[in-house]
């Protein structure tokens, strides 16, 4: 009778592969997390630039920006709160308001504390006035 040789991996070989995979994961995961943060910030920057452009169109039509009370909603529906818009396009200035990457709404302060208007995301923590806020006044700083 012929003895069949068993094929397979030894426990030591499996452990070596697991250790190598762990080392690779420890190198790759931090890089992926950093890229996610950069991508989230870039989305906020793009959204704020788009909102600024829409607000500039609103100002061209109405000689002023929407008030804080009217908010960014004034870009998709005609404000019902005074001062009323003199001219308002049938479809508004944008189709919908974007949300920041963390599911929060962008905020408008008009007149702003940093310029004519302040547009900002409350950041990952969702709390306005904290260090992670990203606003149109911080775009060139970070």
From Swiss-Prot:
Its main location: membrane. The chain crosses the membrane at residues 9-29. Keywords: Cell inner membrane, Cell membrane, Membrane, Methylation, Transmembrane, Transmembrane helix. InterPro entries: Bac_GSPG_pilin, N_methyl_site, Pilin-like, T2SS_protein-GspG_C, T4P/T2SS_Core, Type2_sec_GspG. The modification N-methylphenylalanine is found at residue 9. One of its GO terms (cellular component) is plasma membrane. It comes from the Bacteria. Cleaved by the prepilin peptidase. SUPFAM superfamilies: Pili subunits. One of its GO terms (biological process) is protein secretion by the type II secretion system. Coiled coil: none annotated. Gene3D superfamilies: Glycoprotein, Type 4 Pilin. Residues 1-8 form a propeptide. Residues 122-142 are annotated as: Disordered. It is a single-pass membrane protein. It is found in: Cell inner membrane. Belongs to the GSP G family. Type II secretion system is composed of four main components: the outer membrane complex, the inner membrane complex, the cytoplasmic secretion ATPase and the periplasm-spanning pseudopilus. Forms homomultimers. Core component of the type II secretion system required for the energy-dependent secretion of extracellular factors such as proteases and toxins from the periplasm. Pseudopilin (pilin-like) protein that polymerizes to form the pseudopilus. Further polymerization triggers pseudopilus growth. This is Type II secretion system core protein G.
